[in-house]
């Protein structure tokens, strides 16, 4: 309902326009929550670590690449990028270059399980490029702690069988036991 228009310049300076901030929930609440303490604790990345990304557990590399692309490329994105690629007279086809880039990213991740590999891909590439930008709104006002970014949590996730991570089972069970 227009809450961002008064803050659009401030938000663009915070996130450098690297993400879509026209519907940023963070901007709607930052002024209210920043007065409740000096440290904000974020649950960001819990959804990635404690759930199945939805890829077939037996997906081959080609299907993993296709899966990643469907998660990243927005509607109309291929068309726009392909037209710009052609307009700029770049070699090859955009679709092929993008697929090859993601294939190489996935090959760099030395994990055989497709579900874990996609989770690692998102943690390595997605968080840095998209998810972290939204946090800049919070860190502009307060110090922030993100427990799911800790090495200990990531190492723990690597030891948990997928059946407990899927559908956030382990997370939900923990909440039930600690906050009945």
Predicted segments with their positions:
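ATP-dependent adenylate-handling active sites, centered on carboxylate activation for C-N bond formation
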Residues: 1-112, 133-178
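The feature marks non-catalytic terminal segments
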Residues: 109-122
């Amino acid at each position: 309902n227009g809450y961002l228009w008064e803050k659009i310049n401030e938000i663009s300076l915070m996130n450098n326009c690297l993400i879509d901030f026209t519907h940023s929930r963070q901007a709607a609440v930052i002024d209210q929550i920043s007065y409740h303490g000096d440290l904000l604790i974020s649950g960001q990345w819990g959804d990635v670590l404690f759930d199945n990304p939805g890829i077939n557990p037996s997906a081959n590399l080609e299907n993993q690449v296709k899966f990643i692309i469907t998660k990243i490329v927005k509607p109309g994105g291929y068309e726009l990028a392909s037209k710009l690629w052609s307009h700029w007279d770049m070699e090859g086809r955009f679709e092929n270059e993008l697929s090859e880039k993601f294939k190489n990213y996935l090959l760099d991740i030395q994990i055989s399980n497709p579900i874990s590999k996609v989770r690692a891909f998102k943690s390595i590439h997605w968080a840095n490029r998209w998810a972290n930008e939204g946090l800049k709104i919070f860190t502009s006002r307060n110090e922030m702690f993100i427990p799911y970014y800790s090495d200990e949590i990531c190492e723990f996730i690597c030891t948990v069988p997928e059946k407990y991570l899927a559908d956030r089972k382990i997370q939900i069970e923990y909440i039930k036991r600690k906050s009945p």
